[in-house]
Amino acid sequence: DGPGMRTTVFLKGCNLSCFWCQNPESQSTGPELMYFKNKCIHCGCCINECSQGAVQLANGEIYIQRSSCLTCGACAKVCPTGAMEISGRAMSIEEVMQKVLEDKPFYELSGGGVTLSGGEPLLQKSSVALLKAARQNGIHTAVETAGNLPLEVIEKAMPFVDLFLYDVKCMDDDLHKKVCGASNKRILQNLKFLAKTGAELCIR
């Protein structure tokens, strides 16, 4: 996710729905309850803790009624094996930067820095403020993006991005719509724009 030793900040929310998404929990903007079946010992702690009856045991297996789940995290707190986990939490720029700055000596020694990933990190308005804060602290910045964004969003981020890690999923527009859920026209237009401006790009 960029040169040297880096801290990757994953931001939730994505406007694509790629079949092969490696971080499907990052597609929605809000926190989500994740269940790891291989970690579950069927102790029933989560069932007893859920006030909504969203966690149930049927045929010897744990099931989650997503329509009833409040994503409160009560089940995850009592799970002894980590089979239940909340993915995503709200953090301020200051809180994120506190974590990022912990590894600043490693960035300086290795030529590393911070990488924003996701999801599509630039969908979050606070992403530019986070990039700016990193730059103000002398930290190299990279953004992993699919580029499916209004051009003005990219333009706002550009002054604070040292490297764009640009994910081109598919060149054929019809196939892109089929496997990613959206056209690639804007993605390729934004890529051409970045290339013309001389922005540092790594196309993947």
Enumerate the language-model features and the residues they cover:
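Conserved AdoMet/S-adenosylmethionine-binding subsite of the radical SAM
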Residues: 94-204
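Fold-independent oxyanion-binding glycine-rich loops
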Residues: 11-14, 24, 66-67, 87, ...
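FAD-binding FR-type
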Residues: 60-61, 67-68, 89-95, 99
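Short, solvent-exposed beta-strand edge segments and adjacent coil->beta transition regions
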Residues: 4-6, 52, 59-61, 81, ...
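Hydrophobic packing within well-folded, soluble alpha/beta domains
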Residues: 18, 40, 50, 69-75, ...
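Short, conserved beta-strand segments within well-ordered enzyme catalytic domains
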Residues: 8-10, 56, 115, 142
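N-terminal pre-triad scaffold of radical SAM enzymes
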Residues: 1-45, 62-71
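Iron-sulfur cluster-binding cysteine motifs and their immediate structural context
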Residues: 19-26, 45-63, 74-89
